[in-house]
């Protein structure tokens, strides 16, 4: 009897193109699709399909994004490309497209431009861990020294924002020529794919991380104790594990004495599953929605943090008027709203609907958070903005 063919599922990695308008992000996306499907198989997406980005809504925010997929021998990639600068800002802040790494496209005819800098800053703020540079339009530059100069400028700019500018891969190519099928430029796309495979480490799967479950509901079951319910965000909780209840009140410790899913008793609850966790020695009134259940010591509660936020435009159902310092909205983290005050950067007097801005937020109650956590800004239950924790202050 023939053995079944063993097919290991390839690691899945999320990437995207970033960079200044008209530097060739969409052309590069099409070139990657074209060259990799030609070399390794798969379904090709052409420039027009990618450029015609469908509209999506993430937390009420309208974002135009193109998603394509491609394979290298080692991995499966999901790649996002956005048509407009505003779409990038919204995408990165809301985390609609979480990137394990980004391809920064810089036209060698221009060098780094204002949005090049802004996208690098955003990548730093929202926690994009790795950047690979694709210097585009190199077929249009005859002067070798000029290319070296642009590469040096890009590397310095990345170092300025704490990326390893001296060490990260820079590929000099031409997306258009590769798309037109010229072998020497197609080779550069394969070089880029090789850099993606080797420079961006395999992302940690949600299940391998430290256990955390945002609490949505609390019940007490006569004779058994208190049960908290929610969807496991990452990790695994097993019967007998020690856990901490973090946020809003003082952190308390407990032990998981049972895991339930669809009224069935289980030994464990895993990332992505909705389950109830029975807690030893915890009263119903000790726990509330908005806290998290977590592996001991894995996450801590904080009240003050620096953030990067996007304010919804009027058309997106946001505010019709600007806000000023002293603005006190609610910040919605995971499952609950907490009121907070804002501090605007030096020289910024007001923030208009449709803007993005860095601000420091101080909450009236501590929330379990780490850098990279997304939140919504709400006024009376209506979303008026989206943000991400860039740095914890206190």
Swiss-Prot record:
Binding-site positions, Mg(2+): 26
GO CC annotations, alphabetized: cytosol
Spans annotated as G4: 136-139
Region described as G1: spans on this chain: 19-26
Any one GO molecular function term: GTPase activity
Keywords: Cytoplasm, Elongation factor, GTP-binding, Hydrolase, Magnesium, Metal-binding, Nucleotide-binding, Protein biosynthesis
Region (G5): 174-176
Protein's UniProt keywords contain GTP-binding: yes
Pfam family, one: GTP_EFTU_D3
Alphabetical list of PROSITE patterns matching this protein: G_TR_1 (PS00301), G_TR_2 (PS51722)
Subcellular location: Cytoplasm
G3: region residues: 81-84
Binding site for GTP: 19-26, 81-85, 136-139
Class in the EC hierarchy, top level: hydrolase
Disulfide bonds: none
Catalytic activity: GTP + H2O = GDP + phosphate + H(+)
UniProt keyword Hydrolase present: yes
Ranges for domain tr-type G: 10-204
Listed InterPro entries: EF-Tu_GTP-bd, EF-Tu_GTPase, EFTu-like_2, EFTU_2, G_TR_CS, P-loop_NTPase, Small_GTP-bd, T_Tr_GTP-bd_dom
Residue numbers spanned by region G2: 60-64
HAMAP family associated with the record: EF_Tu_B (MF_00118_B)
Reported function: GTP hydrolase that promotes the GTP-dependent binding of aminoacyl-tRNA to the A-site of ribosomes during protein biosynthesis.
PANTHER family: ELONGATION FACTOR TU, MITOCHONDRIAL, ELONGATION FACTOR TU-RELATED
Family of the protein in this entry: Belongs to the TRAFAC class translation factor GTPase superfamily. Classic translation factor GTPase family. EF-Tu/EF-1A subfamily.
Assembly notes: Monomer.
Protein name: Elongation factor Tu
Organism this protein belongs to: Shewanella halifaxensis (strain HAW-EB4)
């Amino acid at each position: 009897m023939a053995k079944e063919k063993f097919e290991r599922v390839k690691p899945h990695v999320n990437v995207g193109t970033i960079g200044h308008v008209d530097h060739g992000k969409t052309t590069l996306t099409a070139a990657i699709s074209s060259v990799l499907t030609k070399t390794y198989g798969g379904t090709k997406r052409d420039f027009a399909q990618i450029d015609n980005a469908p509209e999506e809504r993430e937390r009420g925010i309208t974002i135009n994004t193109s998603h394509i997929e491609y394979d290298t021998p080692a991995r499966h990639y999901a790649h996002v490309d956005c048509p407009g600068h505003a779409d990038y800002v919204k995408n990165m802040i809301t985390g609609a497209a979480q990137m394990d790494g980004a391809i920064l496209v810089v036209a060698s005819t221009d060098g780094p431009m204002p949005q090049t800098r802004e996208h690098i800053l955003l990548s730093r703020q929202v926690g994009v861990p790795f950047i690979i540079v694709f210097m585009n339009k190199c077929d249009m530059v005859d002067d070798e020294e000029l290319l070296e100069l642009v590469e040096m400028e890009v590397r310095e700019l990345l170092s300025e924002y704490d990326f390893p500018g001296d060490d990260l891969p820079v590929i000099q190519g031409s997306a258009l020529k590769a798309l037109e099928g010229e072998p020497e430029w197609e080779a550069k796309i394969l070089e880029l794919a090789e850099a993606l495979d080797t420079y961006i480490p395999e992302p940690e799967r949600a299940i391998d991380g430290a256990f955390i479950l945002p609490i949505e509901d609390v019940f007490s079951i006569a004779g058994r104790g208190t049960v908290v319910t929610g969807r496991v965000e990452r990790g695994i909780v097993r019967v007998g594990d020690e856990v901490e209840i973090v946020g809003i009140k003082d952190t308390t410790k407990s032990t998981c004495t049972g895991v339930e899913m669809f009224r069935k008793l289980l030994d464990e609850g895993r990332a992505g599953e909705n389950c109830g966790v029975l807690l030893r020695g915890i009263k119903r009134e000790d726990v509330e929605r908005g806290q998290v259940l977590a592996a001991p010591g894995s996450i801590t509660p904080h009240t003050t943090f620096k953030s990067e936020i996007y304010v919804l435009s009027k058309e997106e159902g946001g505010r019709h008027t600007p806000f000023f310092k002293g603005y006190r909205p609610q910040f919605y983290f995971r499952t609950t709203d907490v009121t907070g005050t804002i501090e605007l950067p030096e020289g910024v007097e007001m923030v208009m609907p449709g803007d993005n801005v860095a601000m420091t937020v101080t909450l009236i109650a501590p929330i379990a958070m780490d850098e990279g956590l997304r939140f919504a800004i709400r006024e009376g239950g209506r979303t008026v903005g989206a943000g991400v924790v860039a740095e914890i202050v206190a």
